[in-house]
């Protein structure tokens, strides 16, 4: 038990965020400027191919959908977490990504996304399948 407390304190002090239980994460509503549809534009080194597309959908309630597509669609639901004034996207797979927004640009997981009016058709289908409210 002591080891866990020490490890937790070390992680907190080092600036790393770790999540061991998705259900225990408190979902935080999205600030007005963060809610909406975000999508990569052009090739990015963090994606598997120059043709790959990355999208992040953020609902006003704080639900997220990390949607990556190339030869198939991989969509992982998640939620926004606020820690020390910084927003993170925590996925159901326990991946934790810091969100850095500058106007209509959002950086996370080594990707640069731009605000868009609507998601791709494939990500919209994944959003509906996940049962998330996409109203922004």
Predicted regions and their residues:
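N-terminal glycine/threonine-rich, aromatic-flanked beta-hairpin/loop signature
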Residues: 24, 40-87
């Amino acid at each position: 038990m002591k080891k866990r407390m020490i490890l937790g304190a070390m992680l907190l002090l080092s600036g790393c965020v770790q999540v061991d239980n998705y259900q225990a994460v408190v979902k935080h509503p999205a600030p007005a400027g963060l809610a909406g549809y975000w999508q990569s534009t052009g090739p990015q080194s963090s994606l598997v191919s120059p043709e790959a597309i990355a999208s992040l959908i953020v609902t006003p309630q704080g639900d997220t959908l990390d949607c990556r597509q190339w030869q198939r669609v991989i969509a992982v639901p998640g939620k926004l977490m606020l820690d020390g004034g910084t927003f993170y996207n925590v996925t159901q797979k326990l991946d934790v990504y810091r969100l850095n927004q500058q106007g209509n640009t959002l950086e996370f997981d080594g990707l640069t996304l731009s605000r868009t009016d609507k998601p791709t058709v494939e990500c919209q289908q994944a959003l509906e399948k996940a049962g998330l409210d996409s109203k922004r």
